[in-house]
Amino acid sequence: MCEYLASQGYVVIASRSLGARAIVMTDDVEGVEAQAADIAFLVNGARSLPQADMDKVAVVGFSWGGLSNVFAAARSSRIKALVSLDGSIRFYEKIWSAAGDVRPARTAVPMLSLGAASLPFEELEQKKNRPVASYLNSMKYSDIYFGTMHPMQHGHFSSLYGFRLARDDEFGDYRRADVEQAYRAVALYVHRFLDAYLKQDDKAMAFLRQSPARNGIAPQVMAMRFQPAAATVPSEAGFLRAFAAAGYRDAQAIHARMREASADFALSPLNLNTLGYQLLGGKNARGAVELFKLATHIEPKYGNAWDSEGEAWEALGEKEQAIAAYEKAVAVDKNQLNAVARIKALRAGN
């Protein structure tokens, strides 16, 4: 696989599977964290290669590597695509669920999952008859391709040990030639997937979206199911679009809905204060009040946002609301000198 991708123009960097404290990998959180750290090291090291485009990074993982690459993607925005070759992300629910930062919103990148046919957990989950939860089915922010390679067993996804060094009687009900044919399909799909999502190749994308049979791969060799992204990750930009579409009203309600959709969604009170000032400068004081109120809803002790809200109320001619906002600014931060001055001025009728 590595040699093939390199022959297609990709810069390929690989490492072997090593445990945290020993050569042998352990199937626990410590083991996957160690391998995820190795991936992060390799990705960072690629920055020293002049031919490497760091805006187009993918991580391909076999077996345990098909779990640790998900951990790595959750912690690095550099990783733009994932490939799982019968990866352990399908089987080790207790491990990925124990990592608080490994969640769909943090791994919102396309994934190609090619696996053996023995345990189709993702389909079982959708039928509400699942032995374990499927992380892949929960990746609602990602395009996911589920490929099933019928002739292949787990070890066959490693070409060296899976079939090059295997005896002819180690292929179950299939022949060596059947497994080799399936492996060629695996390599081809990985190549096309990377071309589609890293190089934005339209022909490669069309290849992925049609059935394997249309691509010359027999149904007894491969089946493919495509699960398109069902939503976009809630973001500040998305919040602002929704806020504008709502007529610059209901900022707190929009924020609450987006928080409910994703626990990872967060807005910066500092940014909200800045954005509110931009609306205030654009003669949209009502919208500015909404953002200032949201800022103090998120951070009640943010005195500057209370002071900003006071200014917006003044722009609207709402004296009492302005005084109330300024008083809250001073209550949480005695250094809000503008608020102190405006309270005196407004009470004096100025």
Predicted regions mapped to residue ranges:
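Short amphipathic alpha-helix adjacent to the substrate-entry channel of hydrolases
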Residues: M1-A14
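Short beta-to-alpha linker loops that shape the active-site pocket of alpha/beta-hydrolase fold enzymes
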Residues: V11, R16-G19, S88, M152
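Primarily recognizes the serine-hydrolase "nucleophile elbow" in alpha/beta-hydrolase
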Residues: L42-R106
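The feature captures the conserved acid-bearing segment of alpha/beta-hydrolase catalytic domains
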Residues: A81-H154
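Alpha/beta-hydrolase-fold serine-hydrolase catalytic core, especially in secreted/extracellular enzymes
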Residues: P151-G155, L160-G303, E320, A324-E327, ...
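Residue-level signature of tetratricopeptide-repeat
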Residues: E309, L316, R342-I343
